[in-house]
Amino acid sequence: MRVGIDAHKMKCTTVMFDGDSVTGSFDFQTTRQGVYEFMEKVPEGSIAVIESSTTGKVLSRMLSGKYEVHMVAPPERKVSIKTDRRDAERIVMEDMLNYLRRCYIPSQYIENIRFVVTQQIQIGRRIARVKNQVHALLEMNMIQHELDDISDIFGVNGLKKLSKIQLPRHDMIALARYLEELKMYVSHHRQLDTEIARIAASDNDVQLLMTIPGINCFTAVAIKSRIGEVSRFATKKHLCSYAGVVPKANNSGEYISEHNHVKQGDIVLKYALTCAVRGAILANKNSSIKLFYRKISKKGVSPQKAQIAAARKMACIVWKVLSSKQPYTEQDDHMTKRKMKIMSSKAMRIIPTSVMPSKVSELVRNLVDDIDIIGKYHEHSDYIIGKDLSNKNRLKEDILR
């Protein structure tokens, strides 16, 4: 039996199909209890077809142990009549006819490291945002030139000099707030860096990727998290296409597209490959990636296009290393040992107890005590916070419940 599931945030619609006709349809809530009710109604071993979405990913993990789960890409064409039941019926029938592309369902391990890598990237962007705010604050007060002799104002010497700068009171308050925010993000970045190093230390594929010039611990884990099982890519060209480092085609009849756009692919994988290319370019020794980049650049190609071309070559090397389960043949032994040593030292760090799961409830209680209750109510609310303290207690109870 095949079962089509149209998954939504609050409710899922299910259509059961026996190969000839629809035998039944029912709805269930998108909760654990609702999924258990689904399992009671649908026989074990059935094929569950789910449309790719955030809710669909959660359902696929919960149903994968009991059913054969097919996660499919959403249909590209529009329909004149659209209901949840029709959508569920359409995806189950089109999947049976192989009209829809099936999506890769990563294992729980791959999902976990994907989450850690995404968090690290987000924290890095927040750090860059706060640093830009500090630079803008200094430029507004026309004192940026006083720090020209320092290459990085967020280094040890730069922060010492920054602490002696005199600014107007409101700007000093803003600077203190930015630095406090920066300190928090840097601490989180360090903790995630430790988690990534521990993942790398226990993953053979990641350590093989680190033998490639330009790929460090983070980029290796990022590449591994997005590729998952390399066996799902039949050739290196398939991996390059998945990463989006190949030209996009838009040909029709006698018309041949001559644009320079790159195919849309996995954003995180493309980001990791371009980071690896930049690392290989900045390395002291000449690698095949560095020589290839120089060759492309000498033809008058812009640096961005040359990096994408080198990223395609990097993707081919990654596919070869992961497929053969052998280290990169042109690896720099000294640099590889150095990267492994740095990885081991990071993995040995002790994560502060303040970020342990056991501390979550304590952190929530402390956060509730610091909440500005006035901001929780609209300015035209009937509640008067200053006179009715029971509102604050009720809000605490709601959050802690």
Segments (PLM) and residue ranges:
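Gly/Thr-rich phosphate-binding beta-strand-loop-beta motif of the actin/hexokinase/Hsp70
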Residues: 1-17, 91
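Nucleic-acid-processing active sites and adjacent nucleic-acid-binding tracks
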Residues: 21-45
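Conserved DEDDh/DEDDy metal-dependent 3′-5′ exonuclease domain
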Residues: 37-78
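Short alpha-helix plus adjacent loop in nuclease-associated cores
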Residues: 70-102, 115, 255-264
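Phosphate-backbone recognition surface of nucleic-acid-processing proteins
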Residues: 79, 208-211, 217, 221-299, ...
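A short, charged helix-loop
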Residues: 92-115, 156-167
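Glycine-rich, often acidic, oxyanion-interacting loops/wings at catalytic, nucleic-acid
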Residues: 121-206, 335
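Low-complexity, acidic/Ser/Thr- and charged residue-rich accessory regions of DNA metabolism proteins
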Residues: 254, 293-401
